Every structure is written in C-alpha cells, then in structure tokens.
C-alpha cells in the first residue's frame, strides 16, 4: 500500500545491508556487539546502526519527509569474534552528512550516544573508527605537532624526560615550585602538575603559576636548556580555563595542560585553538579514560579516544607504559601510538587496528609513557616508544634517596646511555640491564637509583587483550 504504515518492524529490514559498498567519505565503525539471548546478530548490528543514526523504535510518519537512504547508518558486515560465544564485530558505515564539521563532540554524541544503553544488547564496545580524509580536513588538530615542538625546545634525537610532582595534593605553591626547580636543574625537560591540581585551598592557581614560572626561568639559566612545566589550566568553566591559559602565556611559559575527558572535547578544542594562535604547547592528560575503555566487552577502546584527541587537539597525551603500573599490552599500545604519531597507518588486526587511517598531514601527537616506571625500565621504554615520546618518571625521580635533583640526574644519565647504546647498534631489549649497570659506574646518582628500585615489578595480567586471529 502507498503511504505511511504505522507499527514496529525489525531493524535488519532497513539497516542491515551486507551488499553496501562503502564510500571514501563514510565514517566506518567497528563495534564489538554482545546481543541478548535470542537476538540474531544481524538484528543486533542493524539496531546499532539505526540507534546511532536515523532510527527509532517504531516507524514514524516523518520518515517520509527525508531520504533515509541518504542519511541512515548501515550495518554492512558482521563477523563472529574468535574464542568468544555470542560476540560479534559489526561494521557500520555512516554518511558524512550526519556530522557537524570540526566537532568531536557531535561525532561521539551520534556514534556512542544512546545506543550503549539499548536493551537488545547485553554489551557494546566501539573498537575503532575510520575517519575519512574529508572530515579530518575540517579539524585543526594538535596546536603544533612533533616537529614544531622539537624546534621550539631545540631538542632532537632522543625521547624527552618528564616528572609529575608528588605528593600530588597538599603542597604549597612555593614548595611545589621548589620541587619543580630541583627536577629541571637535574636534567629533566619537563615537570608536570598532577591532573588533580587545579585551584584548591592549599594552592590557588595564580600562586601556582607564578612559582612555577620562577622555577622554570631559574632552572633554564643554569644548564642553558629550554625547560617547561605543564601548567594545568583545567577549570570548572571554559571561561576560567581560558583565563588560566592567557596568564600562562603572559608569564612566558611554553606549555599548558588539560584533562581532556573530564574537561570535555568542546573545552579541549577551544583551548587547542588558543594554544596554536598563541604559541603554547598543549599537554593532555587522560584522567577518566579507564572508566570508558578498560572493559573488553563494553565501552570504547582507548585508540578511539586517542584518535579523537588528535582531531580535537593536543601535543602530548598519556598513552600507558607497557612496563609500568598502568594497563596496556605492547601490541595494542604500539597500535595507538602509531595512530597518534604517523601520517598513514595500515589496518592491522594483530595490533587492534581495524581500518586503514590517513591523517592527511594533520600534525602528530607525542605519546607520554607515565606510571610506575624507573631507571631499570629506561632501555625497554626507549626501545618501545622511540625518540618521539615523553618518558615521565614521578616517583622514579622524586623517590630517589638523595632527593629530586639527583633523581633527575639518574634518569637523564640512564636515557643518554640508552640512546648512545642504541645509536651504536646495541640491542636494548637484550642488553638493557647491562647498559644501565655500565652507566651507573660513572654516575653515583644512577647507581643509587638502581639499588633502590632493583626489585620493583608490576606483574598483573592486562584486562584488555587482543582477540585471537582467525586461523
């Protein structure tokens, strides 16, 4: 019959289209779908496509006022997950017209909005997105990128060294500044506000900024190296955040920091635009990420949060360590590290990358390895992350038995030894401990660090692991 027909019909009749050929301009998504018992995988995949695009639970007469074929999401493929019962990877294509240009906020509101509470699904996880080049070109991306940062700092050929100041809460502004100065003069490139430090009663933000600036200028003058401190500009409102960034620029500080998930993508993108316009580097902390990404069958993988950050804008982002105290398998971590740094990444399921991604010269982001690392980890970190990284030792600097500056010296000596050994052709993975021992003969600071942390390990199985590849 002609006209509107009320009622409920199966999603798969409209949104499951295995014959669909994807377009270069489509946003492609890979969802890990766990249907409720009795729900066919095709219906579950189609439901995801519908609820994250144009669909609702019943037929509505206003469907006739638009072209659903033009705007609907389509589930174009489903494959079972090897080794899992009743779990599937559903591939969904979204037309580009569904998304506002230059808005990570709108992209995520559409793709991972209501659908994650859908009753027909027991669990749902977004594993990867292919962002088309046409959409990427609507984003500014990182304020500066890797090469511009190296040029600003005049530091080449090695990873950069950082340190989060501890205790993270409770220090006065002056004592915090003193700790910053000690670390920077000892040989670190950066120090960092803890992500929880904003403007609390024990240390208001303006005092914090002033004492950090004093520490940076004093520490730069002694060795003649450019230094930085990640001043956390995160605040309760966007206006307050921008006020703090403006003050950092007025003080001549080279880098500010933002907690991009708790602060939100809209605030982050605004800050990234300001940083590019005003010559500030932008360090990004990922506080709250594990709430979203740690469970294997529900939520969103961190590689998506990393891609979104590259689009929204940030020059550094925390990316796990592989060897420290925080979650992260080596292959998975290297997969999203490449997505952050490289211009073109081929799909590679052995590293969790579902789609080939072309960034069309969007600047890269430097991954930051931070969390439970110390001098014995330096060879592995240098080998895993390479030169374009920040290796950040908080307790691994401040916990040195002789104090902050000797802790910084120990880390710098260990790093320089590893870089020299690598450049001479030595195998860091096989000879790492020997390289550190040799260097410690010439550095009493490194020898003391080696002694105190020789037995420290964080040996726990990762929650988020790769699926077995199909034979």
From Swiss-Prot:
Its EC number is 4.1.1.39. Mg(2+) binds at residues 192, 194-195. It comes from the Eukaryota. It is found in: Plastid, Chloroplast. One of its GO terms (cellular component) is chloroplast. The active site is at 166 (proton acceptor), 285 (proton acceptor). Its cofactor is Mg(2+). Keywords: Calvin cycle, Carbon dioxide fixation, Chloroplast, Disulfide bond, Lyase, Magnesium, Metal-binding, Methylation, Monooxygenase, Oxidoreductase, Photorespiration, Photosynthesis, Plastid. CDD domains: RuBisCO_large_I (cd08212). The disulfide bond which can form in the large chain dimeric partners within the hexadecamer appears to be associated with oxidative stress and protein turnover. Substrate binds at residues 114, 164, 168, 286, 318, 370. It catalyses: 2 (2R)-3-phosphoglycerate + 2 H(+) = D-ribulose 1,5-bisphosphate + CO2 + H2O; D-ribulose 1,5-bisphosphate + O2 = 2-phosphoglycolate + (2R)-3-phosphoglycerate + 2 H(+). The modification N6,N6,N6-trimethyllysine is found at residue 5. One of its GO terms (biological process) is reductive pentose-phosphate cycle. InterPro entries: RuBisCO (IPR033966), RuBisCo_large_chain_AS (IPR020878), RuBisCO_lsu_C (IPR000685), RuBisCO_lsu_C_sf (IPR036376), RuBisCO_lsu_fd_N (IPR017443), RuBisCO_lsu_N_sf (IPR036422), RuBisCO_lsuI (IPR020888). It is an enzyme of class 4 (lyase). The record marks 325 as: Transition state stabilizer. Belongs to the RuBisCO large chain family. Type I subfamily. Heterohexadecamer of 8 large chains and 8 small chains; disulfide-linked. The disulfide link is formed within the large subunit homodimers. RuBisCO catalyzes two reactions: the carboxylation of D-ribulose 1,5-bisphosphate, the primary event in carbon dioxide fixation, as well as the oxidative fragmentation of the pentose substrate in the photorespiration process. Both reactions occur simultaneously and in competition at the same active site. The basic functional RuBisCO is composed of a large chain homodimer in a 'head-to-tail' conformation. In form I RuBisCO this homodimer is arranged in a barrel-like tetramer with the small subunits forming a tetrameric 'cap' on each end of the 'barrel'. This is Ribulose bisphosphate carboxylase large chain. It comes from Anthocleista grandiflora. The lineage of its organism: Eukaryota, Viridiplantae, Streptophyta, Embryophyta, Tracheophyta. The gene is rbcL.
């Amino acid at each position: 019959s002609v006209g509107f027909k009320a009622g409920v019909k199966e999603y798969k009749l409209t949104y499951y289209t295995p014959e669909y050929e994807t377009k270069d301009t489509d946003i492609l998504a890979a969802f890990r779908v766990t249907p409720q018992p009795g729900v066919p995988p095709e219906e579950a995949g189609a439901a995801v496509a519908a609820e994250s695009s144009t669909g609702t639970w019943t037929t509505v007469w206003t469907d006739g006022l638009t072209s659903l074929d033009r705007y609907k999401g389509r589930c174009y493929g489903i494959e079972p997950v090897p080794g899992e019962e009743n779990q599937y990877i559903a591939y969904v294509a979204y037309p580009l017209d569904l998304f506002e240009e230059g808005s990570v906020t709108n992209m995520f509101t559409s793709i991972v909005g209501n659908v994650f509470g859908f009753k027909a699904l027991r669990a749902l996880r977004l594993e990867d997105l292919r962002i088309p080049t046409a959409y990427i070109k609507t984003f500014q991306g990182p304020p500066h990128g890797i090469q511009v940062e190296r040029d600003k700092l005049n530091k080449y050929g090695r990873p950069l060294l950082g340190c989060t100041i501890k205790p993270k809460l409770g220090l006065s502004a002056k004592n915090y500044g003193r700790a910053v100065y000690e670390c920077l003069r000892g040989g670190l490139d950066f120090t960092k506000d803890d992500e929880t430090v904003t403007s609390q009663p024990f240390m208001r933000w303006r005092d914090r900024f002033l004492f950090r600036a004093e520490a940076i200028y004093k520490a730069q003058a002694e060795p003649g190296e450019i230094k930085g401190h990640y001043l956390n500009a995160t605040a309760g409102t966007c206006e307050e955040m921008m006020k703090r960034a403006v003050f950092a620029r007025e003080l001549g500080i080279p880098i500010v920091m933002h907690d991009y998930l708790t602060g939100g993508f809209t605030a982050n993108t605004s800050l990234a635009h300001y940083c590019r316009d005003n010559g500030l580097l932008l360090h990004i902390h990922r506080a709250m990420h594990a709430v979203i990404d740690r469970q294997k069958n529900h939520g969103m993988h961190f590689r998506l949060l990393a891609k979104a950050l590259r689009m929204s804008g940030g020059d550094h982002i925390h990316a796990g360590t592989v060897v420290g105290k925080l979650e992260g398998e080596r292959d998975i971590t290297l997969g999203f590290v490449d997505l952050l740094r490289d211009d073109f990444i081929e799909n590679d399921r052995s590293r969790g990358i579902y789609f080939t991604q072309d960034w069309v010269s969007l600047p890269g982001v430097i991954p930051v390895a931070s969390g439970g690392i110390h001098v014995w980890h330096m060879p592995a970190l240098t080998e895993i992350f390479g030169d374009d990284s920040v290796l950040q030792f908080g307790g691994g600097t401040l916990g040195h038995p002789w104090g902050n500056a000797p802790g910084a010296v120990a880390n710098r000596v260990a790093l320089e030894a590893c870089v020299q050994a690598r450049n001479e052709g030595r195998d860091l993975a096989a000879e790492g401990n020997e390289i550190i021992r040799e260097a410690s003969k010439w550095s009493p600071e490194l020898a003391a660090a080696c002694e105190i942390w020789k037995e420290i390990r964080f040996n726990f199985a990762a929650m988020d692991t790769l699926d077995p590849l199909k034979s």
